[in-house]
Amino acid sequence: MKNVKKGKRKKSDKPQFGLISKILLTINILVVVLYLTACYIGYVDPDSASYLALMPMAYPLFLIATIPTLLFWVVKHRRLMLITVCSWLATIPQICAFMPIHFNDIEQAQSEKGSYTLTTYNTYGFAGDKETKNAIIDEILEKNADFVCIQEATTIDDLRYWHTDPDRIARLCARYPYVHFSNKNHTLGCFSKRPIGIIMEQSIGNYFYVEAYKTSGLGGEIYIINTHMESIGLTVDDKRLYMDLTQTAKKETLKGVRSHLLNKLLRADRQRAVQARLIKSIADSLRTASPHTPLFICGDFNDPPYTYSYLTAKGNYSDAYTDAGVGYAHTYNRNRFYFRIDNIFYDDRLVEAEACRVGTSKASDHHSVTATFNNHNK
């Protein structure tokens, strides 16, 4: 009888898919689903999306959360990298809005013949001491834009009343001989180097204002919409709660605080949705009436990129910072709400964004945003 030798079982060349890998795969899939939801829920009306509509506010966190499992798969199971990589490929527009990479020189762009520069700046009513007011004026003068859209504005007379540096006021008035402030609480205003025509003014409640201006630039007439949309809806006390929440909070109070803040945020988000539709209708009517006139939409939108109100107000227009900015940027700088909520949208059929930068001055609770444009056929 022949002896039959049992062959040794060959070890698989593939790495074992153990318990840790299974747990991480589950976490990876869950994080990617949340990440994709944060990227695309902005296309759904907040009335239908409910609390999910707030997810784009946490987009950076979801993006960062996709990285650890990707690094693990690089070492252990490279094929599973595709889960995260495919989610990134599916969200290239969102990534570019969050972290654009355009190495350009805004000063050089401004010096080009025929260029036109816009600044949008929420000045917080020039609140603060004399030095703060002076610093806000310095920020405006430093940017040297052709047209400056102001939110939470104040009049030149008020600046004089508050004993702001008269030399700075004189330089501001000399640089911008054409000045306008809205009739209601002076919430909106603009400074221009060229004559201004007021097309329309509208407000709803105490926090939403929109104006449309007509001026000249880029070789002809241009339209500029200036807006201040509903704030995030949190009071000073609410913001303190949020700061406590981002540090340490007792377990028994955490749930109640979170629910309180989310309800307020959702209510404000739904109000901005209505306001964004109004802004879109104004832009659409101007575009229909004068399709070959460049139009810009500037202001404090109080919502980060790829939220419903951002996408609705932007419509078919382009975001200057996405197209001509560089790196991560936030335009609100207080209470740990580090979001890019101030924007300049433009009609890329007629003009192109040469460069866009977010200011660094903290004199106001917002940073300024400045963009330089030129005609396609420059």
Question: Which role fits each region the language model picked out?
Answer:
Residues 63-107:
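Transmembrane alpha-helices and immediately adjacent membrane-cytoplasm interface residues
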